[in-house]
Curated annotation (Swiss-Prot):
Residues 403-529 form the Thioredoxin domain. This is NADPH-dependent thioredoxin reductase 3. Residues 1-67 form a transit peptide. InterPro entries: FAD/NAD-bd_sf, FAD/NAD-binding_dom, Ferredoxin-NADP_redctase_2, Pyr_nucl-diS_OxRdtase_2_AS, Thioredox_Rdtase, Thioredoxin-like_sf, Thioredoxin_CS, Thioredoxin_domain. CDD domains: TRX_NTR. Its EC number is 1.8.1.9. SUPFAM superfamilies: FAD/NAD(P)-binding domain, Thioredoxin-like. The gene is NTRC.
Length: 529
């Protein structure tokens, strides 16, 4: 592949740190965007809409009894096929709590955390800033940090965790079948904890500006240098929207909160914080019609409509963030398990039992009323205990006494500096390493742009680590923190994290935004190594 004519502009001696810029195109960069300059300054998915079929209320008479194929506790396989005790679909506080309890009961739960269909491992808390009402954290904790602790605890007790999407499942006959993007699993019970997905407004130009000015994750994208010092807007009037508005004041010059109703629905504490913040303006009775752009194709404003008068106005804003609620991710159970008219999984009151015996639901996928992290965790506990009782009472349980897994070794604890840089190593961090590798590496260079509060970034790292390990001698991996290396991110036009870029022979080959399947990264490396 021929090098872009502008690549290498300003390349100087490699004895001092350089800044790297890169393109933000989803496929290939405009040739003028990637260059290296000399400086001695060292600084730092697929979302989908839920079909909401009409469902009737379930009753005990509608509950299905599926026949078991295993007749004794020693039966862990049928016809040579391994049958797991329990598969947990989804993560978040519900899924991880269920995994902790199931693992401590020696059930060896298999957990499919998901990463695209409906969110990322850790659920909605991965897009939450400060969690101040979860017991045990008097000073609060960020959503991603809380989920990371829960995940490590589940892993410590022996849960098998896979960051894979479940593509289909069958619960009409036992054992149940779960098909993911990479494997097929048989199991005696299922805990369904897929949570809910952020809703979109479906504006006329939403797809055009998605991740280029429109976002449903303030903590993922708000730290982008392109939003720093700009006017931003948030849509919604609940806790999610008010929390996002408050968070964005750390970066924005001013934040506009666009509320359809004549009052906020958020908690009183959140309302007080918003109303008393001079950097936030609340617009009541206001509907978002569309986004506006300038002659350069960049988002420049929002078209608003007053619901009480019908008057339309234009609001200057460089970014629009959604905080308008969620839809339950129950699609995989449609036609198999009873759902209500909004798509929530119906469970027997006070339990996690669905209309199919052996299938349990936990978290926001079955809770349309409370929707709190602590209630989701509680329902995950109930689901795990219920699954254990179900397995025991049906003589299906097989105990697994396995050693506790060691905590994953911490990687990338410090940025590469001149005296510690070693090109023979595969994995690196920071702008110095990127500059050196850009000049000297004959391999494919995979660059991951992250930010400290980005939940999906924590999802993507282990995925990329596995891919990089598979191609250990064919790739170099560099992690760039966009807050530490702001100039790189700004020049690259990085408007959200995570973002991956591939380079080879001083040429940028491709940019991939968000979290994708491992095979997409594998196929690209295989084709270019």
């Amino acid at each position: 592949m021929a090098a872009s004519p502008k690549i290498g502009i300003g390349i100087a001696s490699v004895s001092s740190p350089h800044r790297v810029s890169a393109a933000s195109s989803a496929l290939s960069p405009p040739p003028h965007l990637f260059f290296l300059t000399t400086t001695t300054t060292t600084r730092h998915g697929g979302s989908y809409l839920l079909r909401q079929p009409t469902r009737t209320r379930s009753s005990d008479s509608l509950r299905l009894r599926v026949s078991a194929t295993a007749n004794s506790p020693s039966s862990s396989s049928s016809g040579g096929e391994i049958i797991e005790n329990v598969v947990i679909i989804g993560s978040g506080p519900a899924g991880y709590t269920a995994a902790i309890y199931a693992a401590r009961a020696n059930l060896k739960p298999v957990v499919f955390e998901g990463y695209q269909m409906g969110g990322v491992p850790g659920g909605q808390l991965m897009t939450t800033t400060e969690v101040e009402n979860f017991p045990g954290f008097p000073d609060g904790i960020t959503g991603p940090d809380l989920m990371e602790k829960m995940r490590k605890q589940a892993e410590r007790w022996g849960a098998e965790l896979y960051p894979e999407d479940v593509e289909s499942l069958s619960v009409t006959t036992a054992p149940f079948t779960v098909q993911t993007s990479e494997r097929k699993v048989k199991c005696h019970s299922i805990i369904y904890a897929t949570g809910a997905t952020a809703r979109r407004l479906r504006l006329p130009r939403e797809e055009e500006f998605w991740s280029r000015g429109i976002s449903a994750c303030a903590i993922c994208d708000g730290a982008s240098p392109l939003f720093k010092g700009q006017v931003l807007a948030v849509v919604g009037g609940g806790d999610t929207a008010t929390e996002e508005a408050l968070y964005l004041t750390k970066y924005a010059r001013h934040v506009h909160l666009l509320v359809r109703r004549d009052q906020l629905r958020a908690s009183k504490a959140m309302q007080d914080r918003v109303i008393n913040n001079p950097n936030i303006t609340v617009h009541y009775n206001t509907e978002t019609v569309d986004v506006l752009s300038n002659t350069k194709g960049q988002m420049s404003g929002i078209l608003l409509r007053r619901l009480d008068t019908g008057e339309e106005t234009e609001l200057e804003a460089k970014g629009l963030f959604y905080g308008i609620g969620h839809s339950p991710n129950s699609q995989l159970l449609e036609g198999q398990v009873e759902l209500d008219s909004s798509g929530y999984v119906l469970v027997r009151e006070g339990t996690s039992n669905t209309s199919v015996e052996g299938v349990f639901a936990a978290g926001d996928v079955q809770d349309h009323e409370w929707r709190q992290a602590v209630t989701a965790a509680g329902s995950g506990c109930i689901a795990a205990l219920s699954a254990e009782r179900y397995l025991t009472s049906n003589n299906l349980l097989v105990e697994f006494h396995q050693p506790q897994t060691e905590e994953a070794k911490k990687e990338f604890t410090q940025r590469d500096v001149q005296e510690k840089f070693d090109i023979t190593l595969t994995k690196h961090k920071g702008q110095y390493a990127l500059r050196k590798l850009y000049h000297e590496s004959p391999r494919v260079i995979l660059v991951l742009y992250t930010s400290p509060t980005c939940g999906p970034c924590r999802t993507l790292k282990p995925i990329l680590n596995k891919v990089v390990d598979e191609y250990n001698h064919d790739v170099h991996f560099v992690e760039i923190d966009i807050e530490e290396d702001q100039e790189i991110a700004e020049a690259a036009g990085i408007m959200g994290t995570p973002c991956v870029q591939f380079f080879k022979n001083k040429e940028m080959l491709r940019t991939i935004s968000g979290v994708k399947m491992k095979k997409e990264y594998r196929e690209f490396i295989e084709a270019n190594k």
